[in-house]
Design a protein with these regions (language model features):
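Active-site-proximal alpha-helix that buttresses catalytic centers in soluble enzyme cores
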Residues: 2-70
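Generic beta-sheet signal
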Residues: 5-6, 47, 137-149
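Short, active-site-adjacent cap segments at secondary-structure transitions
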Residues: 14, 56-58, 77-78, 149-151
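Short hydrophobic/aromatic-enriched beta-strand-loop microsegments
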Residues: 29, 67-74, 160-169
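Short beta-strand scaffold positions
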Residues: 51-52, 126, 144-145
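Phosphate-handling substructures
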Residues: 64-127
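Domain-level recognition of soluble alpha/beta enzyme cores
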Residues: 159-184
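Acidic, His/Gly-rich catalytic cores of divalent-metal-dependent hydrolytic chemistry
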Residues: 186-190
Length: 190
């Protein structure tokens, strides 16, 4: 009894090109480049497909060949609080070293803090853990999501603390007998 989980980071958007943290209410569409990247994704089309409610994830799914998906709020990006709408350089200029501390706390499953006015590490990881626990016991699942939930799943499933997954990148995990394995990290086809 095996589950194969394909975690897909949505394809590029204009805010991604600007390298700023997304606003919680922001719902940016894919950029022209993002539409091309999404159209080149190769995923098992018979798999059950889940998507974040955000347009960028839903468009990635549709262009990858998944017109019918289950929308799951748990797959939404982390709530970055007052970091949202700003670039890393802007945050460092305004807050010094504190943004690094906020992101490290958000990236820790037991983190009691996170970005001010945003999620704590514990809240964020609990949201992802609850979604992972609700997945079927076998078959194939494709989830179109964001960097934060994808990285949280890697931390929770295989203990990977640091990774960089490109926009349009895919992480393949396998679960058998209650144990997760990392099977593959795919770069977007270019």
């Amino acid at each position: 009894v095996t589950l194969t989980l394909y975690l897909v980071r949505h394809a590029p958007t204009l805010p991604n090109a600007e390298r700023r943290y997304p606003l919680l209410e922001e719902d940016a569409p894919l950029s022209p480049e993002g539409r091309e990247v999404a159209g080149r994704l190769r995923l098992p089309l018979q798999a059950a497909a889940y998507t974040s409610p955000k347009l960028r994830a839903r468009e990635t799914a549709k262009l990858a060949g998944f017109p019918h998906t289950f929308t799951v709020a748990a797959l939404t990006e982390a709530d970055f609080g007052l970091m949202a709408g700003h670039t890393w350089a802007e945050l460092e200029a305004r807050f010094g070293a504190r943004p690094r501390e906020w992101i490290e706390a958000l990236g820790h499953p037991e983190g009691e803090t996170g970005p001010p006015e945003g999620e704590t590490g514990r809240q964020f990881h609990a949201r992802i853990q609850n979604w992972l626990a609700a997945l079927p016991g076998e078959g194939e699942v494709v989830a179109f999501t964001h960097a934060g939930p994808l990285l949280a799943a890697l931390r929770l499933c295989v203990g990977l603390r640091a990774a960089e997954v490109a926009l349009g990148g895919v992480v393949v995990l396998k679960r058998a007998q209650g144990q997760w394995w990392l099977r593959e990290l795919r770069l977007p086809h270019g």
